[in-house]
Regions:
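An N-terminal, well-structured beta->alpha segment
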Residues: 1-63, 67-69, 144-167
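Surface-exposed loop/turn and secondary-structure junction residues enriched for glycine/proline
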Residues: 9-19, 23, 78-81, 86, ...
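Generic secondary-structure boundary signal with a strong preference for alpha-helix termini
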Residues: 23-26, 59, 88, 111, ...
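Catalytic-loop motifs flanking and including active-site residues across diverse enzymes
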Residues: 28, 79, 176
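Ferredoxin-reductase
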Residues: 33, 40-115
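Short C-terminal domain-edge/linker segments immediately following a structured domain
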Residues: 38, 75-78, 126-131
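Gly/Ser/Thr-enriched, mixed-charge loops and adjacent short helices
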Residues: 108-178
Length: 178
């Protein structure tokens, strides 16, 4: 049974081990892969934050995404803006970030971009709920961590300070980078 409340206006969010179980995440991946392929794209960037449930969700999501021959460009553990950056300068303008954002540690979710536009959980809700299970063993993953250095260079090139200052960083439970 799918908790329909996980489908939100700007993302998908819920209790990682209950609402976002492997079966549901896989279905979401299948639906997103179809949506991406309809735009003429055949790749998607994928990043995760540092939550304990991220790798399990990633594995199930990749299974669903690859079920329709979509190539997953794996960014690894990165801050959310890096996924958006990748969709602007990389090999595709589609990306998914597995992140619980500011929510409690038991939660997790997905932020999705297709053709430079945010994907609402509402947009895919009915397709996910009505999807019949489809099995496949095809996995097509490429390492895309080379974009991390480009992202860092872009950030540093836009930060010109007139003098040396002390900086404190609070990543807010996110993946703040190296």
């Amino acid at each position: 049974m799918i908790n329909e409340n996980i489908f939100r206006a700007y993302d998908i969010r819920g209790k990682a081990d209950e609402d976002l179980n492997d079966s549901i995440i896989r279905k979401i991946g299948i639906v997103l892969s179809k949506k991406i392929l309809k735009t003429g794209q055949n790749k998607v960037y994928l990043g995760t934050d540092c939550r304990l449930s991220a790798n399990r969700i990633k594995k199930s999501l990749i299974s669903g995404l690859c079920s329709n021959d979509l190539e997953v460009l794996d960014l690894g553990m990165v801050p959310t803006p890096l996924v958006y950056f990748a969709t602007k300068i990389g090999k595709t303008n589609c990306g998914i970030m597995i992140t619980g954002s500011h929510n409690p540690k038991e939660d997790n979710g997905l932020k999705m971009v297709i053709n430079d536009g945010a994907v609402s959980g509402f947009e895919i809700k009915n397709d996910v709920i009505n999807l019949k299970n489809k099995t496949t063993n095809i996995v097509n993953i490429s390492d895309a961590r080379d974009l991390i250095e480009q992202y860092e260079n872009e950030i540093f090139s836009n930060c010109k300070l007139p003098k040396k200052i002390k900086v404190v960083l609070d990543s807010g439970n996110g993946a703040a980078g190296p």
